[in-house]
């Protein structure tokens, strides 16, 4: 299982006062909706306020995440689904989303929870989407990472 050794996503984080935007791609709707639901559950449990911004796909996640953070969000949870096909498109989109989201976090100084699934097939996504029968909940994990980092940055910055 790819989630083996993950930090304690069940650890309670106090997200009171944090404004978080879930930025989610629309491709592979069933998986994407599962990721969103997991992120929502985590943010709700932490007491954070949140909203959702939908974008066409994972390639658009960085620019929308940057806009959300520049508009005042304390953190972003970026969720997307990229499934390998028969062309190099998978590699280009995966690299662009990953590199772009990393730059957004570094340039804004605000956390971006990375919930972009890069998959060989749809079954892998369904297994990670936090749906009934899934073994993992990557949407919840990405939201937890964004919240935990926002809290840590708040403490570091005094």
UniProtKB/Swiss-Prot annotation:
PANTHER family: 6,7-DIMETHYL-8-RIBITYLLUMAZINE SYNTHASE, 6,7-DIMETHYL-8-RIBITYLLUMAZINE SYNTHASE DMRL SYNTHASE LUMAZINE SYNTHASE
Family: Belongs to the DMRL synthase family.
Chain's gene name: ribH
Role description: Catalyzes the formation of 6,7-dimethyl-8-ribityllumazine by condensation of 5-amino-6-(D-ribitylamino)uracil with 3,4-dihydroxy-2-butanone 4-phosphate. This is the penultimate step in the biosynthesis of riboflavin.
Residues annotated to bind (2S)-2-hydroxy-3-oxobutyl phosphate: 86-87, 128
Binding positions (5-amino-6-(D-ribitylamino)uracil): 27, 58-60, 81-83, 114
Pfam families according to UniProt: DMRL_synthase
A GO molecular-function annotation: 6,7-dimethyl-8-ribityllumazine synthase activity
Known pathway: Cofactor biosynthesis; riboflavin biosynthesis; riboflavin from 2-hydroxy-3-oxobutyl phosphate and 5-amino-6-(D-ribitylamino)uracil: step 1/2
Origin: domain of life: Bacteria
Source organism: Leifsonia xyli subsp. xyli (strain CTCB07)
Keywords: Riboflavin biosynthesis, Transferase
Active site residues of this protein: 89 (proton donor)
Catalytic activity: (2S)-2-hydroxy-3-oxobutyl phosphate + 5-amino-6-(D-ribitylamino)uracil = 6,7-dimethyl-8-(1-D-ribityl)lumazine + phosphate + 2 H2O + H(+)
Keyword set includes Transferase: yes
Annotated Gene3D superfamilies: Lumazine/riboflavin synthase
Gene Ontology biological process terms from the UniProt entry: riboflavin biosynthetic process
Enzyme Commission numbers on file: 2.5.1.78
InterPro entries the record matches: LS, LS/RS, LS/RS_sf
Name of the protein in question: 6,7-dimethyl-8-ribityllumazine synthase
Keyword set includes Secreted: no
CDD domains: Lumazine_synthase-I
One CC-aspect GO term: riboflavin synthase complex
């Amino acid at each position: 299982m790819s989630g083996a050794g993950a930090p304690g996503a069940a650890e309670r984080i106090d997200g009171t006062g944090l404004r978080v935007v879930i930025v989610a791609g629309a491709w592979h709707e069933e998986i994407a909706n599962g990721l969103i639901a997991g992120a929502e559950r985590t943010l709700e449990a932490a007491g954070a306020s949140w909203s959702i911004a939908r974008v066409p796909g994972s390639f658009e996640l960085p620019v929308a995440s940057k806009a959300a953070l520049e508009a005042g969000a304390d953190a972003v949870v970026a969720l997307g689904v990229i499934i390998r096909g028969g062309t190099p498109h998978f590699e280009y989109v995966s690299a662009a989303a990953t590199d772009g989201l990393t730059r957004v976090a570094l340039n804004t100084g605000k956390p971006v929870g990375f919930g972009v699934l890069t998959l060989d097939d749809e079954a892998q996504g369904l297994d990670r989407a936090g749906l009934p029968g899934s073994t993992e909940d990557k949407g919840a994990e990405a939201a937890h990472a964004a919240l935990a980092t926002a809290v840590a940055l708040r403490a570091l910055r005094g």
